[in-house]
Amino acid sequence: MEHVDTIVIGAGIAGLTAARLLVGAGRGVVVLEARDRVGGRVHTDRSEGRVTDLGASWIHGVEDSRVADAAIAFGMPVVEFTVGGYQPDGRPIAYFGADGRRLDADATARFVADVRTLDAALGPVIAGSAPDATYRDVTETALAAQGWPADRSARVREHLEHRSEEQYGVRIEDLAAHGLDDDVIAGDEVVFPDGYDRLASSLAEGLDVRLGHVVSRVMWAPEGATVPGFSADQVVVTVPVGVLQSDDFVIEPPLPDRQRDALARLRMNAFEKVVLRFPHRFWDADVHAVRQLGPHGAWWHSWYDLTRLDGVPTLLTFAAGPVARAVRGWTPERVAESVTAQLRRLYGAQVPDPTDVIVTAWQDDPFARGSYAYMMPGSTTRDHDDLAEPVGGVLHLAGEATWTDDPATVTAALHSGHRAACAVLGWTVPIASAWS
């Protein structure tokens, strides 16, 4: 059995950050990764000479962002694309009404103003909500207080429903009232024309990463931890919530009640990307996104123009929440037909068949079991930190679901890896030493 100071399970951003900081502090570390690549849910497809991020895409706000700092240090080019947080405005967005016609500037401004008004009203309603309240509950309370006509309320309600689905891949009634508390964008959002996976590969440089090494059992005790083939003084586990909750990954002895209860109040979402490349552009020029209002947008309601990144006319949409589950198992061609039918409702017969279709399948990935975690009703933001509380001075959990301030992001993964490394060491190391 090979012995090291620390075993890190998972070569995603959390695991790689923790490992890099520990190695920098002089510790012996092995990173065990089940996949044949590093990055975890940061995964870039480079087939046919194109760059497509299948997992994480955005830095959601570059102001005071450690991920942005790392990207700069690693020489990763970025492109500003500030619509990833489902903002109602700020960048050009073509809104289409329930009748399939584009809203004019005045109608768009009125709709956006209503969304902003409700968002402002939501804050105090959420703050005073019951522990088991859902985002649906607080939305309805805030809407009722506005006294708007039914159709006006319906459009804003619909926007919040779609935002919940696009931000967390879950229906609004299944998300805790506090589930979007950290959905705040500070500064521009950016994407990576050369792929987000450059962050993972850069963090992995110089580390002892064992690919194709599936860990299904972690044994820990006061004197250390073992996994098949390895022993260590401490272990950092960075597998996603969906894996932690599965029978295929066992921690013995089990997690203490505090961590186990926090874990039980989180769930992995259903959230898939659909990338469509077309022979020519047919949608509105000079817009970042196209959005469909009204009941026809129940499935496909938002498309993001990736042409600047791709070099060919390209739209990105999402199968989120119930839609992702409904199309699970569909062929990419069938998904494309469904999406294209909706686009033709907006743009008519000029919409051609796509020349290329990519549909992700994170729900079916045994090492992810979804895209990222969300807070169920009854959960609190404290659950993220409770999950990360060190166990016995030996076992440490890290990953996007263990960071309170900005969960479900690469930022959360990076910071959680830093926190785990500091807990292992027993002192604080600068996070920037992971890339400087």
Protein language model regions, located:
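FAD-dinucleotide binding site
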Residues: 1-436
